[in-house]
């Protein structure tokens, strides 16, 4: 009951409003506010009132302008960067090493036999076209060639370039002769790959400025088609094993061997080996700078067994990266040359970004709308993994198969000429698509916490001419138990990886403008220009609420009056009285209220006394204008 009473009082208070007019509210505010200026508007003479009114408006506008600048600066989410450099005990980076040749030619040769023969025929056709006709009928497997052939483009006539096929008749109705091709080769025709759709209705040409580039890219594309049809375990067995590649290992003062490395299969480089990856064991620390406290390796790359057309670079591909991160060694790695000792001084850059809304980065990639196809390796998120997963996803959706160089989701197949004849055309279009790259870049985010390794590299010949004899003897005996030298300078690589004197550099972001900075500047501007405080803002908010309150009450009253006017307009005359309404219910004959005048009646028949009712009218609550509880509450309020 008491709650209902208080609610009714509150409702009546809302209906009555503040009890002031607009003018009274303004006068009250100017007289009672703690802000300088408004008081002078109502206390001074007419001229000073006008002056203080203009000054108050001017300074209020300045305050609002300054507030807008500070709020816009705060919402720009700017950051400040702090840099710290020093030396401390840190985890040694994970080191990934790969051979430049992904496979041993002696083990993969049977898979590449047809492709190698075709490659040799192409070289003969390019280098000695007048001699290649004698071998034109040689037994070649043209099924590979027909999917993606190499062509010569004669652009001596830029308005009508000619496309010359290396094998068979020329296209576009062109005549074919060895002489014309010889002249074309002598003058340097461009070589290109012709990529066509399944029904050959759409064909594109991928041009190259050098025949070396064209032949290398064409061979890799065809080899990709072959490797995609071979189980990965067989490819692992055809690559370089760790016990043959890693001849010697030393970390600090502790010896190590190939068993301390984790093996993964990387499509570009075959078997790769990772030291100190931290997947199953704790990361190894390093507390001192210099080569004596780093990692030392002697590697045998077996250059004599390289695939001739697949690996044109000899050496070791290596990369330093963080523990539990996937090594994208093709994009971020470096080469170490055979026959040299390569020393690498390491400086660790730790980047710590603020995250949303200051920078579009992610902590673990959970909010990135791209399925991570590298999740099977149980590695941390990286933007490289996201970009490649995004490309593979587009490849599967557009070409119905995945590229051999990237991991596959479950249930999908790698692209090959047998199952997907037009995959090369689709892959080329997707690879050159700017829209696809922009889409993936827009969806993938950088990691908020990133570690980069800056390397200072120096090289020297190793071993020297004076010591190579005994060094190769010892290494050959350890590897093959042979008294003869089975190693050579062109197959040996020595690596030294260590921390520099200053081994870390931390680059950390922090908010340039926080909420404390914003409130301080807002209050400072308000206090400087108008002498106000937070309480002054509360007073101003109160007067705004009262203004809105009065306006709402006036609008409600106006709506009621308009409704009443519409109701009155629906009647022809004045509204009926209560007596007329009662008479309408009892006078079923609709007789007139006054009897007809007789000659004996007086001049004023309406003055005739009406009959007195025998019983008083019923005491209906509906005849009251207000409920009893409202009347009682009003009376109690007046008494209070």
Curated annotation (Swiss-Prot):
MF terms in GO: ligand-gated sodium channel activity; WW domain binding
Modified sites of kind Phosphoserine: 633, 635
Listed InterPro entries: ENaC (IPR001873), ENaC_chordates (IPR004724), ENaC_CS (IPR020903)
Extracellular compartment spans: 72-532
GO biological process, one term: intracellular sodium ion homeostasis
Catalytic reactions of this protein: Na(+)(in) = Na(+)(out)
Cytoplasmic side of membrane: 1-50, 554-640
Mutagenesis / variant outcome for changing residue 267 to L: In BESC1; decreased channel activity
Annotated keywords: Cell membrane, Cytoplasmic vesicle, Disease variant, Disulfide bond, Glycoprotein, Ion channel, Ion transport, Membrane, Phosphoprotein, Sodium, Sodium channel, Sodium transport, Transmembrane, Transmembrane helix, Transport, Ubl conjugation
PY motif, short sequence motif: residues: 616-620
Record membrane topology: Multi-pass membrane protein
Any one GO cellular component localisation term in the record: apical plasma membrane
Glycosylation sites (chain numbering): 260
Role summary: This is one of the three pore-forming subunits of the heterotrimeric epithelial sodium channel (ENaC), a critical regulator of sodium balance and fluid homeostasis. ENaC operates in epithelial tissues, where it mediates the electrodiffusion of sodium ions from extracellular fluid through the apical membrane of cells, with water following osmotically. It plays a key role in maintaining sodium homeostasis through electrogenic sodium reabsorption in the kidneys. Additionally, ENaC is essential for airway surface liquid homeostasis, which is crucial for proper mucus clearance.
Disease (UniProt): Pseudohypoaldosteronism 1B2, autosomal recessive: A form of pseudohypoaldosteronism type 1, a rare salt wasting disease resulting from target organ unresponsiveness to mineralocorticoids. The disorder affects multiple organs, and is characterized by an often fulminant presentation in the neonatal period with dehydration, hyponatremia, hyperkalemia, metabolic acidosis, failure to thrive and weight loss.
Similarity-based family: Belongs to the amiloride-sensitive sodium channel (TC 1.A.6) family. SCNN1B subfamily.
NCBIfam families: ENaC (TIGR00859)
Name listed for the protein in its UniProt record: Epithelial sodium channel subunit beta
Organism: Homo sapiens (Human)
GN (gene name): SCNN1B
